[in-house]
Swiss-Prot record:
Stretches of the chain found on the membrane's Extracellular side: 1-67, 123-142, 206-234, 326-343
Region (Neurotensin binding): 321-344
Protein topology in the membrane: Multi-pass membrane protein
Residues with glycosylation annotation: N4, N37, N41
Disulfide bonds: C141-C224
Subunit organization: Interacts (palmitoylated form) with GNA11.
Protein name listed in UniProt: Neurotensin receptor type 1
Function: G-protein coupled receptor for the tridecapeptide neurotensin (NTS). Signaling is effected via G proteins that activate a phosphatidylinositol-calcium second messenger system. Signaling leads to the activation of downstream MAP kinases and protects cells against apoptosis.
Processing and modification events after translation: N-glycosylated.
GO molecular function, one term: protein-containing complex binding
Length: 418
């Protein structure tokens, strides 16, 4: 990718060019991609620059590579999240999980699925291949960014809520019985989606379709871009970054660290006290016997809980770092090299962004043997080829033994993992 050296409006520019303009500032060159959802194509970014004189040329190999990656993520993510949602919606699946965790998993699968279905095709078409004109109208522009941000908020908040649910279930099981009723969980998840929609409302007033041609009439000048002052755009970006990344990341990191420490203690107690560990909060505790195989499962759970936090940071941190570049890099610091870096960094970070919507079903299958069994059974029902591969004798699970003054279902032990 390169920025052509000639500036818009320089001598020799044909006067009849509809994109001709005397001057185009850095603000226009960065405003659209500064929100993190538009490409760095300069013919779109600069108000009236002739595409032949000031352009960002992404080589065809990069476009093909990004397209191949996006298509792979789209197929894996769509299938994985669809099967996950279908699995969690089945009556038998809900009975097997016997907790409210399936509501959180289902909500997260829905937000990931919507992110892939609503955002990826538009981005691949209008921000990777066809930078301008914007093809979906003003309502499409505002709606695209609104829905994309709403799904982003929903995904982040759903991951955080799942961590809260697991924290209560593992560290405070008695409180969890009271606080995590099905009706309360449904209301809580509904509140998450409502909050996500409200947090995304500013995008309806921030983005819009504009014609950046010199006469304001040329169809090739239509772009989807911020329509408000740059300073306000930067505020919206920073608020979005805090609410959709920093806040959820802190919640996830803190709670999963506590959960991992708790599971580590349970594993140590089980090893030292003959497979018996203590579970409970400050005011009530009880001892619980764990089958030998559960010790290894708990160790695995500690590792995977850490992997969940790492995956969230790896997939989302570069994406938000790129968006914040627009806020904190001054006009004078933007160079042709930085433009090049930004454009390709955009492709990498957005690919990671979509990885986060694809990887969750994979993590569920890695973490929970119970979920994996149900997931594969559902996939076998939907896919005849997979059904033939999975023909084998059924097996039964032994219930976990519990010794305490309280009664705890065997599945409560299995559900210490996601």
């Amino acid at each position: 990718m390169r920025l052509n050296s000639s500036a818009p409006g320089t001598p020799g520019t044909p006067a009849a060019d509809p994109f001709q303009r005397a001057q185009a500032g850095l603000e226009e060159a960065l405003l659209a991609p500064g929100f993190g959802n538009a490409s760095g194509n300069a013919s779109e970014r600069v108000l009236a620059a002739p595409s032949s004189e000031l352009d960002v040329n992404t080589d065809i190999y990069s476009k093909v590579l990004v397209t191949a990656v996006y298509l792979a993520l789209f197929v894996v993510g769509t299938v994985g999240n669809t099967v996950t949602a279908f699995t969690l919606a089945r009556k038998k699946s809900l009975q097997s999980l016997q907790s409210t965790v399936h509501y959180h998993l289902g909500s997260l699968a829905l937000s990931d699925l919507l992110t892939l279905l609503l955002a990826m095709p538009v981005e691949l078409y209008n921000f990777i291949w066809v930078h301008h004109p914007w093809a979906f109208g003003d309502a499409g522009c505002r709606g695209y960014y609104f829905l994309r941000d709403a799904c982003t908020y929903a995904t982040a908040l759903n991951v955080a809520s799942l961590s809260v649910e697991r924290y209560l279930a593992i560290c405070h099981p008695f409180k969890a019985k009271t606080l995590m009723s099905r009706s309360r969980t449904k209301k809580f998840i509904s509140a998450i989606w409502l909050a996500s929609a409200l947090l995304a409302v500013p995008m309806l007033f921030t983005m819009g379709e504009q014609n950046r041609s010199a006469d304001g009439q040329h169809a090739g000048g239509l772009v989807c871009t911020p329509t408000i002052h740059t300073a306000t755009v930067k505020v919206v970006i920073q608020v979005n970054t805090f609410m959709s990344f920093i806040f959820p990341m802190v919640v996830i990191s803190v709670l999963n660290t506590i959960i991992a420490n708790k599971l580590t203690v349970m594993v140590r107690q089980a090893a030292e006290q003959g497979q018996v560990c203590t579970v409970g909060g400050e005011h009530s505790t009880f001892s619980m016997a764990i089958e030998p195989g559960r010790v290894q499962a708990l160790r695995h759970g500690v590792r995977v809980l850490r992997a969940v936090v790492i995956a969230f940071v790896v997939c989302w941190l570069p994406y938000h770092v790129r968006r914040l570049m627009f806020c904190y890099i001054s006009d004078e610091q933007w160079t042709p090299f930085l433009y090049d870096f930004y454009h390709y960094f955009y492709m990498v970070t957005n690919a990671l962004f979509y990885v986060s919507s694809t990887i969750n079903p994979i993590l569920y299958n890695l973490v929970s043997a119970n979920f994996r069994h149900i997931f594969l059974a559902t996939l076998a029902c939907l896919c005849p080829v997979w059904r033939r591969r999975r023909k084998r004798p059924a097996f039964s699970r032994k219930a976990d033994s519990v010794s305490s003054n309280h009664t705890l279902s065997s599945n409560a032990t299995r559900e210490t993992l996601y």
